[in-house]
Regions:
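Mg2+-dependent endonuclease catalytic cores in nucleic-acid-processing enzymes, primarily RNase H-like
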Residues: 1-3, 13-14, 33, 63, ...
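Short cysteine/histidine-rich metal-coordination sites, predominantly Zn2+-binding motifs
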Residues: 2-27, 311-316
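A contiguous, basic/glycine-rich beta-loop/short-helix subdomain that forms a polymer-engagement track
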Residues: 13-108, 120
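Extracellular low-complexity, Gly/Ser/Thr-rich intrinsically disordered linkers
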Residues: 30, 34, 39-46, 50-55, ...
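Hydrophobic, well-ordered secondary-structure elements that form the walls
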Residues: 111, 158, 295
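Short acidic, Gly/Ser-rich segments with clustered Asp/Glu that frequently serve as metal-coordination loops
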Residues: 112-116
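Active/binding-pocket-proximal capping segment
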Residues: 123-127, 313-316
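Acidic two-metal-ion nuclease catalytic site recognized across multiple nuclease folds
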Residues: 304-322
Length: 322
């Protein structure tokens, strides 16, 4: 094994040679890549720590840190291994025995439709394991609140999507103490920690929204909380959890066909970006309803915010210590 010493690192840098990896590239376009193992100002112990954190992230369902480690630290291409099909597969289920000894958090997530709501309740452990508790389609705001109380969920831990009928959602959040959420096309959001470090996460900092905007009471009532969540990142994580490629994620034994169908309501499609590189995006499958899928995405986001998963979804910007 090599020791992380200045003379050894310098010897590595002096003895290295550049290799052509794409002989078909135009002669007027030249690019270079090298591993962070080479520069003497990058400590190997930091690279080892980054790699171990990335491997730990895989155990709870996300490839984001490993992708950053391979592409940004090692300078090697990332190869997507996620399937793009929408074929229905049997979901993992639990024994429906309660109380669950490992439960640390319980969230309700709600998708708003014209005439009804989709509501999902899921229990989470601190290490990212989770169990579906309940799902249903309440008809009124009051029904949603009754279910929150029935399943013993704190008001601010009920997260409701505000993309549709936002003004009524804001009013309901003010009335009942709920929290708003909204999906975003962004892959991550900037956060500044108390120590001044800059990090990027799959959800935004809290945004305060005036529930009375556009009315005479605008600016005179207490604002409600809103969090944006990354559509691409969170859906990638949920996919991995659903496929058993992370922490334990289970449904009820009698979740039903509608729940199962909607959990396979979106799939990833590949397209080429302007540079000709493959980009993967989530798309709805035909006219298949995806409301439960969205509720489960908000569950993943809530788990990140509660730090059941958060540690492994934090990407420290290069040059920062965290």
């Amino acid at each position: 094994p090599f020791i992380d010493r200045q003379d050894i690192r310098n010897a590595f840098a002096r003895s290295g040679v550049w290799e052509v990896t794409n002989p078909q590239a135009p002669s007027e376009k030249v690019s270079f890549r090298w591993s962070a193992v080479l520069p003497p100002w990058v400590a190997w112990r930091d690279l080892v720590q980054e790699f171990l954190q990335a491997k730990a992230a895989l155990r709870v369902g996300t490839t984001v840190p490993l992708k950053a480690f391979k592409c940004e630290s090692l300078g090697v291409p990332w190869i997507e291994e996620m399937e793009t099909d929408d074929e229905l597969r049997e979901l993992s289920v639990h024994d429906d025995a309660w109380p669950w000894p490992d439960e640390d958090f319980r969230f309700a997530t709600v998708d708003v439709q014209k005439d009804l709501f989709y509501l999902v309740v899921r229990a989470w452990s601190k290490d990212g394991n989770s169990r579906l508790v309940h799902w249903s389609k309440p008809l009124t705001w009051e029904d949603v609140e009754e279910l929150r109380i029935e399943y013993n969920i704190k008001p601010h831990l009920l997260f409701i999507d505000s993309a549709y009928n936002a003004q009524k959602v804001y009013a309901a959040c003010k009335r009942f103490g709920w929290t708003c959420m909204r999906g975003s096309k962004l892959r991550d959001f900037a956060h500044k920690l108390k120590d001044g470090a800059n990090v990027r996460r799959a959800y935004s900092p809290r945004v305060l929204v005036d529930p009375a905007i556009g009315t005479k009471a605008q600016g005179r009532v207490r604002p409600v909380s809103l969090f944006h969540w990354s559509n691409p990142t969170v859906k990638d994580v949920l996919y991995n959890l659903r496929e058993g490629k992370g922490a334990s994620w289970t449904a009820l034994p009698d979740s039903g066909q509608e729940y199962e169908l909607q959990m396979f309501s979106e799939r990833r499609k590949e397209r080429a970006d302007k540079a000709g590189q493959p980009v993967y995006e989530w798309h709805r499958v035909g006219k298949r309803a995806n409301h439960i899928w969205d509720c489960e995405c908000m569950q993943v986001t809530a788990a990140m915010m509660a730090r059941c998963l958060e540690t492994f979804f934090t990407i420290v910007e290069k040059g920062q210590k965290h």
